[in-house]
């Protein structure tokens, strides 16, 4: 059994992904990050029997923790990884947290006149800019961090780039999906230095999770 100082630190995002990833860890290793973290007011909890320490942090910060070595392993949405590319090893699609980054506009809105750059409200500044640039469309990107769906109705934007799971919030705000930008799911990411320092332990962790993902997929069919 590894000592406390030898535990592999796994950064897990708060919210829905914590619950979904906990089911995978429980299947793979018999430990649930959610149950461990619920039992403490701290943002870290140890599972020495599995050689792991779990830390619960904001989803958007997981990649930074892993890239800079504060955690060896993390769970990150593909949207985060493609919005701001990181120097991380991505060995596994966990198949959880499935969503889609989309372009949406008001239902029944008339097309903009040729040559007029659309005003695009989004938190995905890079993804949106790259998407419209690839189409040869000059776009004015308006950065927002919340309530993006109301931007068109308030006259702030002509269209939005946002992430959706069911599309219900879009429909409730009178928006229709125009294009899909990126299919998203959560990925396992690993610090590249840690991969050299703990190759065998990380290989076993990755393979255990890979088997858990495969089993979950088989059950879902």
From Swiss-Prot:
Alphabetically ordered keywords of this record: Amino-acid biosynthesis, ATP-binding, Cytoplasm, Glycosyltransferase, Histidine biosynthesis, Nucleotide-binding, Transferase
The protein's Enzyme Commission number: 2.4.2.17
Reaction(s) catalysed by this chain's protein: 1-(5-phospho-beta-D-ribosyl)-ATP + diphosphate = 5-phospho-alpha-D-ribose 1-diphosphate + ATP
Principal EC category: transferase
GO terms under cellular component: cytoplasm
GO molecular function, one term: ATP binding
Record flagged with keyword Nucleotide-binding: yes
Subcellular localization: Cytoplasm
PROSITE patterns reported in the protein's UniProt record: ATP_P_PHORIBOSYLTR (PS01316)
Keyword NADP assigned: no
NCBIfam families, per database record: hisG
Subunit structure comment from the entry: Heteromultimer composed of HisG and HisZ subunits.
Physiological role: Catalyzes the condensation of ATP and 5-phosphoribose 1-diphosphate to form N'-(5'-phosphoribosyl)-ATP (PR-ATP). Has a crucial role in the pathway because the rate of histidine biosynthesis seems to be controlled primarily by regulation of HisG enzymatic activity.
Free-text note on domains in this protein's UniProt record: Lacks the C-terminal regulatory region which is replaced by HisZ.
Similarity-based family: Belongs to the ATP phosphoribosyltransferase family. Short subfamily.
Protein name, per record: ATP phosphoribosyltransferase
Source species of the chain: Anaeromyxobacter dehalogenans (strain 2CP-C)
Gene (name only): hisG
């Amino acid at each position: 059994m590894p000592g406390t100082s030898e535990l592999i630190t796994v950064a897990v995002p708060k919210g829905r992904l914590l619950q979904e990833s906990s089911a995978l860890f429980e299947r793979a290793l018999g430990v649930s990050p959610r149950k461990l973290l619920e039992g403490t007011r701290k943002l870290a909890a140890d599972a020495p029997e599995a050689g792991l320490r779990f830390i619960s942090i904001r989803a958007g910060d997981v990649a930074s923790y892993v890239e800079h070595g504060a955690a060896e392993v993390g769970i990150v949405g593909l949207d985060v990884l493609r919005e701001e590319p990181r120097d991380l090893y991505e060995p596994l699609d966990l198949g959880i947290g499935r969503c889609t980054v989309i372009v949406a506009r008001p239902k029944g809105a008339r097309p903009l006149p040729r040559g007029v750059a659309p005003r695009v409200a989004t938190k995905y500044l890079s993804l949106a800019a790259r998407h419209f640039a690839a189409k040869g469309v000059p776009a004015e990107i308006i950065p927002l961090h919340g309530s993006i769906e109301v931007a068109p109705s308030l006259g702030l934007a002509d269209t939005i780039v946002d992430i959706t799971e069911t599309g219900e919030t879009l429909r409730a705000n009178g928006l229709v999906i125009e294009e899909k930008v990126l299919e998203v799911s959560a990925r396992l990411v690993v610090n590249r230095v840690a991969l050299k320092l703990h190759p065998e332990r990380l290989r076993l962790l990755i393979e255990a999770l890979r088997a858990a993902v495969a089993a979950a997929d088989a059950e879902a069919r």
